[in-house]
Amino acid sequence: MVPEAELEQTEAGLVPASSGWFVMNARDARWFDKPKQGHSLPLTGYDEYEAETFFPMLGMSIRVMGPGEPTGTYHWETEQEDFLVLAGEALLIVEGHERRLKQWDFVHCPPETRHAFIGSGDGPCVLLCASSRQFQKDGPWGFYCADETAARYNASSPEDTQDTDLADARFPPSRPMRYREGLLPD
């Protein structure tokens, strides 16, 4: 029988403290303020320890970004990634092309698909992000990419690199935070 996981209450919200099944409301969980990139709820681990210890097979997060805010730096990963727009609108930069997205649009990125999302429209965009972690242990996770189209939206790395510090140098560090009322739609 699979045990129920313990959830630990931190200053920023709930986080898993042991392996097992659990139920956790997104509004009670630990969020991160990502200056110039909106907000993030890493549902399956924020760092390597949490991901490998509690969620070795699947990565999943909720991203909330305002108009003009990228989710991060244009990149590709060795794993499949999938995305669902839960609310609002976004601009997808994929393989150097722009695609407008609206609520309930689903985006599938096979391994090595270069991509980034930018909030658009009149209000916040809520994006569900999911990826496999099956092969990340066998080699590099992926690559940050320099791209003209992504650069127009502050979503490009200055050069192709695997160095997160270099790729994200234009963004202030993320900070853990409690859920802020209004981030998620009712």
Label the model's feature ranges.
Residues 57, 62-67, 75-94, 132:
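Short, conserved beta-strand element in jelly-roll/cupin
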Residues 82, 96-112:
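Short acidic-glycine-tyrosine-enriched beta hairpin
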Residues 88, 104, 117:
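Short hydrophobic/aromatic patches on the structural cores and recognition surfaces of FHA
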Residues 39-48, 61-77, 111:
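Conserved short histidine dyad/triad with adjacent acidic residue
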Residues 132-162:
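Surface-exposed, gly/pro-biased binding rims or lids
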Residues 1-57, 152-186:
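A short, N-terminal "cap"/entry segment at the start of jelly-roll beta-barrel domains
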Residues 91, 111-138:
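Ligand-binding loop in jelly-roll beta-barrel domains
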